[in-house]
């Protein structure tokens, strides 16, 4: 199993030339929260062309600063500051629905355990809008009319250092219908070792044990 995991890691780390590694597609698992409901409606600017959570206005807009989510804090919990300890409103990792109750907001977290990743690109289509954070740091927000289309919103996440990273998303809708499309890729991605993989120090001890066992067998044979 250990050798198999190493082979998989190498294949993901050094893909065939010109081929990106696909990390997430629309149906892939993430943590999901659909308990926000309409608690954010008309906050952060109201039903205006520059409002973050309108009820009717379908204007195209972008948001350089993060929204105030205090009216949904009970639903979201510490999702931006402590994603390792989500409250009971969050699902376990499961396939993310590509639509939700119209006129409400939902939140998603994708977790990446990696030994390093390069040129991570995230492409989204959302009806109507979205807000994104990486490890709790706000990246961008935007809204556009019409249905979801691939590449509607594109995020250049750059390189990820070794460790666990969280891409936190809030999807906005203000009625009618909605939809969600995602495709996240990297030029290279080395998965973080699963819990069953021994630490390097343990491997050294294991190797020393095998060497000692071999010497004992040689002495007995002599």
Regions found by a protein language model. Name each.
Residues 114, 118-131, 167:
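Aromatic-lined ligand-binding clefts that engage carbohydrates, nucleic acids, or primary amines
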Residues 21-91, 95, 111, 166-195:
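Accessory carbohydrate-binding/adhesion or oligomerization-edge regions at the termini
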Residues 5-14, 207-209:
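Sec-dependent N-terminal signal peptides
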Residues 94-106, 142-148:
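Extracellular beta-rich ligand/substrate-recognition surface
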Residues 100-113, 153:
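Short beta-strands within extracellular/lumenal beta-sheet-rich domains
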Residues 16-20:
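Sec/Tat signal peptide C-region and signal peptidase I cleavage site
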Residues 196-216:
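A short, hydrophobic C-terminal helix/tail in secreted or cell-surface proteins
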């Amino acid at each position: 199993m250990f050798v198999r995991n190493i082979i998989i890691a190498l294949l993901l780390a050094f893909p065939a030339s010109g081929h990106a590694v696909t990390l997430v597609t629309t149906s892939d698992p993430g943590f999901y929260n659909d308990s926000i409901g309409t608690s954010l409606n008309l906050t952060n600017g109201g039903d205006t062309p520059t409002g973050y959570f309108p009820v009717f206005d379908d204007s195209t807009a972008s948001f350089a600063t993060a929204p105030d989510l205090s009216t949904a804090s009970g639903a979201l919990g510490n999702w931006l500051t402590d994603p390792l300890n989500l409250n009971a409103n969050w699902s376990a990792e499961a396939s993310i629905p590509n639509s939700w109750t119209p006129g409400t907001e939902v939140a998603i977290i994708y977790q990446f355990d990696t030994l390093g990743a390069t040129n991570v690109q995230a492409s989204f289509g959302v009806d109507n809008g979205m807000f994104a954070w990486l490890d709790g740091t706000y990246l961008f927000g935007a809204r556009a009319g019409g249905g979801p289309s691939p590449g509607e919103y594109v995020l250049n996440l750059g390189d990820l250092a070794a460790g666990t990273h969280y891409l936190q998303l809030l999807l906005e809708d203000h009625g009618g219908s909605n939809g969600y499309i995602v495709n996240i890729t990297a030029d290279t991605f080395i998965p973080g070792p699963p819990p069953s993989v021994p630490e390097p120090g343990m491997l050294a001890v294991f190797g020393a044990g095998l060497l000692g066992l071999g010497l004992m067998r040689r002495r007995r044979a002599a």
